């Protein structure tokens, strides 16, 4: 019989203590994304001579977190336990000496519905309607249009300012391309783009976007913009949403050079240079080592399978 896992189960509310924190450890805690938390406070204590300086923190996470994940957030040297008491009591305990390293969000009242003002504060802090929807679902449903308009006029709306990674997976039908895409990230972080359709209904800023069974069914210039690094909005029925994907997964039965006619697009290299990785399905007979079944293998173009440079 398999042994049961030991250690604390995933939990939303944790407390931690870190003795003799370095500036690097303090900065790591300061720089944690505020969207991680419903409420977070960390105080500095023991600053007087003769006492041990330490950090005393309390976190009410937006989602349940494992013991190891909490350790990763706050540092391997931290002593961590599940929190007891209310958020307000933990706030008072962590701030009792008056030296606050960081505080974000607002203490939650267990059993009481979050009010609109707290949802608005979270929206303006994070610039994310998704975060508000996750943390304040009732308030979000009742005030969606107002919150969306506030975000637009506030100038706080998140915009892409990074290069979106583009991973292309090529192989015959039934070899597992779609399953590979499903395993890439959590379902809640993944959006599957409907094919042959300009609408992005249901997209809420997910960090992974899948173009499944792709063979050129997006307009050329739209695909280039998706795979770039600049701010972009995509259309939904009745509005637009910012495109915030950090990874695009393209599965296809065809290699990229077959997606569009070279005579119909101005410069195919514009797409190829945006591709980060390219993988092809290989059967055992095609591989240099004996493998019982086929598998995906990354290639390093230019090569026989794809005679063009990528990722430059």
From Swiss-Prot:
Changing residue 179 to R: In strain: Isolate IBRS-2. A divalent metal cation binds at residues 45, 54, 97. GO terms for biological process: DNA replication; rolling circle single-stranded viral DNA replication. A motif (RCR-2) lies at residues 54-56. Its main location: host cell. It catalyses: ATP + H2O = ADP + phosphate + H(+). A motif (Nuclear localization signal) lies at residues 4-15. The active site is at residue 93. ATP binds at residues 171-178. Residues 8-107 form the CRESS-DNA virus Rep endonuclease domain. Its cofactor is Mg(2+); Mn(2+). Its EC number is 2.7.7.-, 3.1.21.-, 3.6.1.-. GO terms for cellular component: host cell nucleus. GO terms for molecular function: ATP binding; ATP hydrolysis activity; DNA binding; endonuclease activity; metal ion binding; nucleotidyltransferase activity; RNA binding; RNA helicase activity. InterPro entries: CRESS_DNA_REP (IPR049912), Helicase_SF3_ssDNA/RNA_vir (IPR000605), P-loop_NTPase (IPR027417). A motif (RCR-1) lies at residues 15-18. Belongs to the nanoviruses/circoviruses replication-associated protein family. There are 3 rolling circle replication (RCR) motifs. RCR-2 is probably involved in metal coordination. RCR-3 is required for phosphodiester bond cleavage for initiation of RCR. Interacts with the capsid protein; this interaction relocates Rep into the nucleus. Essential for the replication of viral ssDNA. The closed circular ssDNA genome is first converted to a superhelical dsDNA. Rep and/or Rep' binds a specific hairpin at the genome origin of replication. Introduces an endonucleolytic nick within the conserved sequence 5'-AGTATTAC-3' in the intergenic region of the genome, thereby initiating the rolling circle replication (RCR). Following cleavage, binds covalently to the 5'-phosphate of DNA as a tyrosyl ester. The cleavage gives rise to a free 3'-OH that serves as a primer for the cellular DNA polymerase. This is Replication-associated protein.
